[in-house]
Amino acid sequence: TSHLPHLIAYNLVKTAVDFQKRNKKNIIKYSAGGLRDFSRTAASNEIMWRDIFFSNNDNVINSINIFIKNLNNFKKLIKYKKNKNILKILKNSKKVRKQIIDLKQDVSKPNFGRDIL
């Protein structure tokens, strides 16, 4: 799953470009910080990431399948306006984000300075 954020970033930027072309609107010019943040990840070396995706393709494909399942579930929750279910996912994601920040990753150390169980 560690490669999934890069794959999603590349695809989110592509989606913005495709949406912009289809709707003939300047989506990218007027996008907010979220797209900018994803585009930072998408600015990574494309040759390196191609090689990473290909060398670890089984795990990458498995992560994509799980992501698609979760994305389709999210789509259904939005379609049917499942307020409690959506809030549960959003709150849990916020909680996980806080846990990630609380780990105080140190990029200069192996495993980002975390104890790996």
Feature names for model-found ranges:
Residues T1-S39:
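Anionic-ligand binding region
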Residues I8, L71, K75-I78, R97-K104:
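A structural signal for well-ordered alpha-helices, especially hydrophobic packing surfaces
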Residues A16-V17, F67, I78-Y80, L103-D106:
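Short, charged/polar low-complexity linear motifs in solvent-exposed/disordered segments
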Residues N23-S93:
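Interdomain hinge/lid region at the active-site interface
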Residues I89-K95, Q99-I100, F112:
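N-terminus-biased detector of the onset of the functional/mature region
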Residues Q105-L117:
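A conserved regulatory-domain signal marking ACT and ACT-like small-molecule sensing domains
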